[in-house]
Amino acid sequence: IFNLSYTQAMLVQFCFFTAYALMSIPAGKLVEKIGYKGGVIGGFLIAAFGCILFYPAASSASYPIFLGALFILATGIVLLQVAGNPYVTLLAKPGKESATLTLIQAFNSLATTIAPPLGAAMIFVDANASLAERISSVQMPYLGLAGFMILLAVTVAMIKLPDARQIAQAETEHNHDGKTSVWQYKHMVLGAVGIFCYVGGEVAIGSMMVNVLEKVAGLDHEKAANYLALYWGGAMVGRFAGTFIMDKVKANQLLAFNASVAGALIVLAIVSGGKVAMWSLLAIGLFNSIMFPTIFSLGTHGLGKYTSQASGIICSAIVGGALIPVAQGAFADTIGLLPAYFVSAICYAYIVFFALKGYKVDEKTA
């Protein structure tokens, strides 16, 4: 429908991550008022509205309207993340927060793995198709997705769920830490930096993977795209496996191990090149698997009534997915494709620090 330059095409990613930067903290304050369940319902409805707006965007062939619809859709996803992630951790059994959230995130990874080929089959049409056919191929899937999200919102509204705000308030009364601001929790701030580094590193590696597979491993574009699925699919496998591993290993210890291995794989890729670099970088997807849910649960642990605000702050750090890839790309232009991966290696080094020391709750809070 649109004939876009590379810069215009990149506005899609920019709009998506900008929603996290701008809307996460307001979403946290909203959840504080309407509750976690209300936030989940609202997230589904806002996302559905964004999907509906793709209909007029396609009809008018207006890219600005398309970007506006995408921003609204992303805002709904932000609210879902801000409300849903802490909701899961607050309702989980004590000590099982990371494992429970990892299991939930595993289904997210499952959707991420199967959605691209499914979406491509539904949306992409023959190159010789008429404009009307191309417009319809975009409109109908998004209307269907909007209907599905509305159905989910109604389902959540009908299910009787506990008020997690009461659990959070009880946690605050039990701790008696005397803190008057969410920013006084050092482990929360360090956790937000951890999310910034994790999402940035993950997206940077994934975004440049096809270039590595083509220029370093010598694959053609089609094969490179197929191999890329292994990177994202590894996250799905790792999350399902991580759920059970966390029954035996402490969450922070598993996080430290995974981040250390990911960093080591990057170093191996840089010094080796060729197929060794290819398989090393693809394997990182497996070790990325448990990082987001584990960093999130450790960063929001013991915050009580401040949990919703903390969730907003931590989710705003997802903007790292827009900034760190740009930095790594700039280094790739100057020092080379593989050497530029040192940027992602630094991200994983920070995550190791957070997993070993930064996650610890202040003694007054414990």
Segments from the language model and where they lie:
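Helix-loop-helix hairpin linking two adjacent transmembrane segments in secondary transporters
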Residues: 94-95, 99-161
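Helix-to-loop junctions at the C-terminal end of transmembrane segments
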Residues: 23-36, 123, 238-250, 332
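Hydrophobic core of transmembrane alpha-helices in multi-pass small-molecule transporters
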Residues: 63-80, 276-290
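C-terminal ends and interior cores of transmembrane alpha-helices
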Residues: 45-60, 260-273
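Central cavity-lining transmembrane alpha-helices of secondary-active solute carriers
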Residues: 11-29, 229-241, 320
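Extracytoplasmic gate region of multi-pass secondary transporters
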Residues: 115, 180-229
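Intracellular juxtamembrane helix-capping segments at the cytosolic ends
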Residues: 79-93, 289-304
